[in-house]
Amino acid sequence: MLWAVVGHSISKGTTNFVPVKLFVLGRPGSGKSEAYRQIDKYIQQSHKNWSVIHFTDYEILQEMFQFEKYFQLNEKLRKFQPREHEGFDVRDFSVLDDVLKELEKKIRFRVSNVCNEQLIVIEFARDDYGKALKLFSPNFLKDAYFLFINSDINTCIQRVHDRVAHSSSIDDHFVSDDIICSYYKRQRIPFKLERVDFLNSNKVQVITTKMHLINNKGSQQDFTKKINRFINSIIKHEEQEKSSSILGEALTQWGHNHILVRASKLRMRAVSLLRN
């Protein structure tokens, strides 16, 4: 009886699909976009029941830059500085906070109706990731995974120049040496991100400890293996969680059905006794 209920739960798909969020963090040129491309390739090959959606803050920043370029005539009020290769530097870093808030809205809108197993890859670069991640709502960060890709400044700069010279993707945009050596010089990584609950200022809510670090200093093959291994661990964990959830729902349903059956039998017995 119990396993029949479990089978019914699985066939009916009683567990709702909840997208899994993966934040991919690191300096420009560290390998974030390359990591996404490998994630997408690996999932298509090895986990065909999953799909991947990619979000970056750069698209929003670029839209803001283009709008300012044509409509903000007052040079002093401009928040972006045009650079070579159709790139730009951020002059007013407050826009970086605004962009992340807008990014959350964009993601929530796009993934409001999920009909399969889905991995949401969210990519951005900052100097202080603890501060940046606190701009997202706690519910949005709940159960998310975090991948920080580490690479030294000189390597990042060289990769940026190489990708601009030999562009093969829309993600191959230019970032100036100046901004990499100044704003992105330090990388603060929150291995334990905490937020004060404003309804109770004495309470601290732990948001996540799921921060994984990969050093992208070796060969492309080595980097690929690290990415595949990490993604496989995420999917394995999520599928185990889903199986546990389905079993829990089945047990609850079985218990409910069992009580109804017993109640029905007792009622029939009582009616029989009254008639006698």
Predicted regions mapped to residue ranges:
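Extreme N-terminal, non-catalytic leader segments
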Residues: 2-21
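NTP-dependent small-molecule kinase module
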Residues: 2-3, 188-276
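Hydrophobic anchor at the beta1->P-loop junction of P-loop NTPases
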Residues: 24
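The conserved Walker
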Residues: 28
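Conserved glycine(s) of the Walker
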Residues: 31
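Conserved substrate/cofactor phosphate-moiety recognition/catalytic segment
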Residues: 37-98
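Glycine-rich phosphate-binding loop used to anchor ATP phosphates in small-molecule kinases
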Residues: 83-141
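Conserved phosphate-donor/acceptor-positioning beta-strand/loop module used by diverse small-molecule
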Residues: 123-124, 140-160
